[in-house]
């Protein structure tokens, strides 16, 4: 059994969609990045890759590659799940925390959990997604960006 942790941060940018946990959330601005900038799925991907000692998201999906420009991060997470399976691992659980001031994501959490579970081919009750604000402190509090932290447990299949 192994534990992994993943952290990701993206700044907000006008004119981009806000995609979090594979869900398109109504917002006047979205997260900026080479892919769809799904901060939650990136943190989950890094946690899983780290637990399996398979590097990180930047190694597998470099932001210098045109192949990954604007790619749906659910595709990336599915690839991570298959990579773990190929290396003899299975996901036991995922626990993730989203840090952003606005918009509120409570109405979208169930869909985020389902999306992560579907990508990893696990049951939804093995995935937890929570959110908190930064109490108006720092770049998150000023609504300049968002962050996500994720931990996971994997075990040999």
From Swiss-Prot:
Family: Belongs to the IspF family.
Cofactor(s), names only, from the UniProt record: a divalent metal cation
Alphabetical list of Pfam families matching this protein: YgbB (PF02542)
Keyword DNA-binding: no
HAMAP family: IspF
Residues under site feature: Transition state stabilizer: 34, 133
Binding-site list for 4-CDP-2-C-methyl-D-erythritol 2-phosphate: 8-10, 34-35, 56-58, 132-135, 142
Enzyme class: lyase
Lineage top rank: taxon: Bacteria
Record keyword Lyase present: yes
The protein's assembly and partners: Homotrimer.
GO biological process, one term: terpenoid biosynthetic process
Binding site for a divalent metal cation: 8, 10, 42
PROSITE patterns (UniProt xref): ISPF
Biological or metabolic pathway of the protein: Isoprenoid biosynthesis; isopentenyl diphosphate biosynthesis via DXP pathway; isopentenyl diphosphate from 1-deoxy-D-xylulose 5-phosphate: step 4/6
Record protein name field: 2-C-methyl-D-erythritol 2,4-cyclodiphosphate synthase
Coiled coil stretches, renumbered: none
Keyword list, A-Z: Isoprene biosynthesis, Lyase, Metal-binding
CDD domains: MECDP_synthase
Segments crossing the lipid bilayer: none
Catalytic activity reported: 4-CDP-2-C-methyl-D-erythritol 2-phosphate = 2-C-methyl-D-erythritol 2,4-cyclic diphosphate + CMP
GO MF, one annotated term: metal ion binding
EC number(s) given by UniProt: 4.6.1.12
Co-factor binding details: Binds 1 divalent metal cation per subunit.
């Amino acid at each position: 059994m192994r534990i992994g942790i993943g952290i990701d941060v993206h700044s907000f940018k006008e004119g981009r969609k806000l995609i979090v946990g594979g869900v398109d959330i109504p917002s006047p601005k979205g997260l900026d990045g080479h892919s769809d900038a799904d901060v939650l799925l990136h943190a989950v991907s890094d946690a899983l890759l780290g637990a399996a000692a398979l590097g990180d998201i930047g190694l597998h999906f470099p932001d210098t590659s045109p192949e990954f420009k604007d790619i749906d991060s659910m595709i990336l997470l599915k690839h991570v799940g298959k990579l773990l399976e190929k290396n003899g691992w299975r996901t036991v659980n995922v626990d993730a925390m989203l840090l952003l001031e606005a918009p509120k994501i409570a109405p979208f959490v169930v869909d985020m959990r389902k999306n992560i579970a579907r990508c990893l081919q696990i049951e939804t009750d093995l995935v937890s997604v929570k959110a908190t604000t930064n109490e108006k402190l720092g770049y998150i509090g000023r609504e300049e960006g968002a962050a996500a932290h994720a931990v996971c447990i994997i075990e040999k299949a």
